[in-house]
């Protein structure tokens, strides 16, 4: 089973939206960690320009809805998925990461999946835009709501075991 963690990303600490997204996508897409970029996949965006595309979606969302949040605004989400060492190839992990992202967002949000092979355990980072592809809605984090009420379930991913942290 794989462990998966969802982390909301905020601008915070004086950073602008574009810089915050550029920093996180730059980190997860690092060629040294992703087999020279071969383990980076995008949906609804080009991984090389995803930061700019996420920014355009955010601006379009504000223009369409008139909704603007402050510093606490969630600009994107970061899913981390880790596997037990030796149990999965980086290519399989990337494919499973893409499947998870598609299921998690219902194919409605642009995302970048970057699989790292620089540690003992293979792990994927999934960054997806908080704004949907139609730029008229934002992702609602029902998973975190269920977690806080103790209603989460353990999901297995193709029989893979969890990494102990």
Residues covered by each model-derived region:
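N-terminal nicking endonuclease/strand-transfer module with a His-rich metal-binding environment
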Residues: 1-165
């Amino acid at each position: 089973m794989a462990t998966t963690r969802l982390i909301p990303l905020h601008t915070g600490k004086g950073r602008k939206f574009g810089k915050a997204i550029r920093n996180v996508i730059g980190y997860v897409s690092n060629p040294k960690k992703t087999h020279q970029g071969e383990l980076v996949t995008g949906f609804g965006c080009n991984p090389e320009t995803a930061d700019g595309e996420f920014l355009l979606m955010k601006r379009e969302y504000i223009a369409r809805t008139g909704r603007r949040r402050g510093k606490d605004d969630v600009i994107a989400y970061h899913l981390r998925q880790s596997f037990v060492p030796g149990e999965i190839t980086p290519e399989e992990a990337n494919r499973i990461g893409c499947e998870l992202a598609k299921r998690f967002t219902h194919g409605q949000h642009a995302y970048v999946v970057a699989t790292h092979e620089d540690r003992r355990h293979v792990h994927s980072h999934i960054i997806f835009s908080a704004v949907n592809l139609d730029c008229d809605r934002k992702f609602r984090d029902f998973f975190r709501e269920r977690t806080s009420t103790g209603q989460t379930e353990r999901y297995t991913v193709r029989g893979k075991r969890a990494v102990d942290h």
